[in-house]
């Protein structure tokens, strides 16, 4: 049986090894095919880059030709536009001159017409006033003639003296009335003249306002003409500058230096075109890599989510197993309870039998009482032990329940953690997608990579000095406290001393210090730096590490990690070589202190 089992296991082992070898072969084939595909892809990419560069160069030459032709067309169109503008300017000037002359003539005629109107109004008013005066004088004459006639008649009738006096007063009053009427008429005439003068002045004011507006329009037209003249002056200045530049053109003069500069500029433009093409191809490659990283993140998130569900299933299986175990324990306890009940029933039956035969066994009462007392004591002890056992069981159940609650909380927290990790990965993937969609491509400043170089120490110490310094450092670092050494026994102290010496010997070898800034004093750091080979690394590696810790999708992490690994390997190789060379030369020097310590006293005792 055992031989069959061994043969079966060997067969299974062979099958597993064969399957492993097949899997390794398939993996190698896949890797080789992937490498071939990558090489083909690189070749195709290089071919595409060369083709695009050639097309871009042709495009650049054609653009230059098109630019030259467009410049010629622009120059011709500029000349045509200049001639048109000159003709337009001439026409505008003529129109302005004609409009100005016409406006001046119109203004002169308007002023003449207004003057004639004013004179006409004044003549009409004077004529009206004179007519009114003539009519008034006629009325006065008629009144005076009537009065004279009346007076003559009354005189003839021989009126009394009183009547004559009254008549004289009446005539005087009438004369005063007439004089007052004349004054009123004169004042009315004066008022009419003033009103006419006011109307004339208002007309003059309106005319002056119109003239002012016309003068303002003329000033605006003059200002526009001045601005146009300034623009024309600027155009002429630009044309003059262009003419000066054309006069100073190196191609026209045939200067070799400027021609060389022009050739260099054309070469730099071609190089710029090639760099642009390469940049576009690398940009597309970067976008493809980002998409692959996005897919990987989504796959990781789904795997984390599946892992969370798997852990939940494992927890369920574990809880079911614990439930089955507890059910078995409960069944076992129920069986024990039944056995105890049977034993109790038998004990009660045994106690009932001696009570029936009590009349026959009166002599053996002493032994029965003694046994009864022992049984009672044993029962009490059993009950106390049962109580303690029940208390312990309750405590155990309480602790198990508490442990189960803690485990449930732990599994719930783990599940929440995994779900949160998966959600975090999904959110990161979404954030990367949104960045790729909406954020513009930032100008990435390419860091200038410094070359790695080895800085050898100037003041090289001898092997003995190095051993002395290293032994002093080892003694300072690996020195045990005296209190602990006194408490230990002599053999242990000797063994510790040997271990201490071995440690100090192992530490005396110089090491390549990749991070010299540790918890050491300044003078010790200086001593170590004199004995070590410094590696001045590339600053881009630190940036790559920082970007790696931040999980930024934009940073080329794989290249930075590979560079870092290669540099660390080179540093290790150089450090191992230096260790081998120094281990051959260095020998540990032991220093024994003059004071008596327990380490030195134990061998003497």
From Swiss-Prot:
<feature type="coiled-coil region">
    <location>
        <begin position="2"/>
        <end position="442"/>
    </location>
</feature>
<keyword id="KW-0539">Nucleus</keyword>
<keyword id="KW-0832">Ubl conjugation</keyword>
<feature type="modified residue" description="N-acetylmethionine">
    <location>
        <position position="1"/>
    </location>
</feature>
<comment type="function">
    <text>Required for the localization of dynein and dynactin to the mitotic kintochore. Dynein is believed to control the initial lateral interaction between the kinetochore and spindle microtubules and to facilitate the subsequent formation of end-on kinetochore-microtubule attachments mediated by the NDC80 complex. Also required for correct spindle orientation. Does not appear to be required for the removal of spindle assembly checkpoint (SAC) proteins from the kinetochore upon bipolar spindle attachment.</text>
</comment>
<dbReference type="GO" id="GO:0043515">
    <property type="term" value="F:kinetochore binding"/>
</dbReference>
<protein>
    <recommendedName>
        <fullName>Protein Spindly</fullName>
    </recommendedName>
</protein>
<keyword id="KW-0995">Kinetochore</keyword>
<keyword id="KW-0597">Phosphoprotein</keyword>
<feature type="region of interest" description="Disordered">
    <location>
        <begin position="544"/>
        <end position="580"/>
    </location>
</feature>
<dbReference type="GO" id="GO:0000922">
    <property type="term" value="C:spindle pole"/>
</dbReference>
<feature type="compositionally biased region" description="Basic and acidic residues">
    <location>
        <begin position="564"/>
        <end position="580"/>
    </location>
</feature>
<dbReference type="GO" id="GO:0007080">
    <property type="term" value="P:mitotic metaphase chromosome alignment"/>
</dbReference>
<keyword id="KW-0007">Acetylation</keyword>
<feature type="modified residue" description="Phosphoserine">
    <location>
        <position position="513"/>
    </location>
</feature>
<keyword id="KW-0158">Chromosome</keyword>
<dbReference type="GO" id="GO:0005813">
    <property type="term" value="C:centrosome"/>
</dbReference>
<keyword id="KW-0175">Coiled coil</keyword>
<dbReference type="GO" id="GO:0000132">
    <property type="term" value="P:establishment of mitotic spindle orientation"/>
</dbReference>
<keyword id="KW-0206">Cytoskeleton</keyword>
<feature type="modified residue" description="Phosphoserine">
    <location>
        <position position="515"/>
    </location>
</feature>
<keyword id="KW-0963">Cytoplasm</keyword>
<dbReference type="InterPro" id="IPR051149">
    <property type="entry name" value="Spindly/BICDR_Dynein_Adapter"/>
</dbReference>
<dbReference type="GO" id="GO:0019899">
    <property type="term" value="F:enzyme binding"/>
</dbReference>
<dbReference type="GO" id="GO:0016477">
    <property type="term" value="P:cell migration"/>
</dbReference>
<dbReference type="GO" id="GO:0051301">
    <property type="term" value="P:cell division"/>
</dbReference>
<dbReference type="GO" id="GO:0005829">
    <property type="term" value="C:cytosol"/>
</dbReference>
<keyword id="KW-0132">Cell division</keyword>
<keyword id="KW-0498">Mitosis</keyword>
<dbReference type="GO" id="GO:0000940">
    <property type="term" value="C:outer kinetochore"/>
</dbReference>
<feature type="modified residue" description="Phosphoserine">
    <location>
        <position position="555"/>
    </location>
</feature>
<keyword id="KW-0137">Centromere</keyword>
<comment type="subunit">
    <text>Interacts with KNTC1 and ZW10. These interactions appear weak and may be transient or indirect. Interacts with dynein intermediate chain and dynactin (DCTN1). Interacts with the catalytically active form of USP45.</text>
</comment>
<keyword id="KW-0131">Cell cycle</keyword>
<dbReference type="GO" id="GO:0005634">
    <property type="term" value="C:nucleus"/>
</dbReference>
<dbReference type="GO" id="GO:0034501">
    <property type="term" value="P:protein localization to kinetochore"/>
</dbReference>
<dbReference type="GO" id="GO:0007094">
    <property type="term" value="P:mitotic spindle assembly checkpoint signaling"/>
</dbReference>
<dbReference type="InterPro" id="IPR028593">
    <property type="entry name" value="SPDLY_chordates"/>
</dbReference>
<comment type="similarity">
    <text>Belongs to the Spindly family.</text>
</comment>
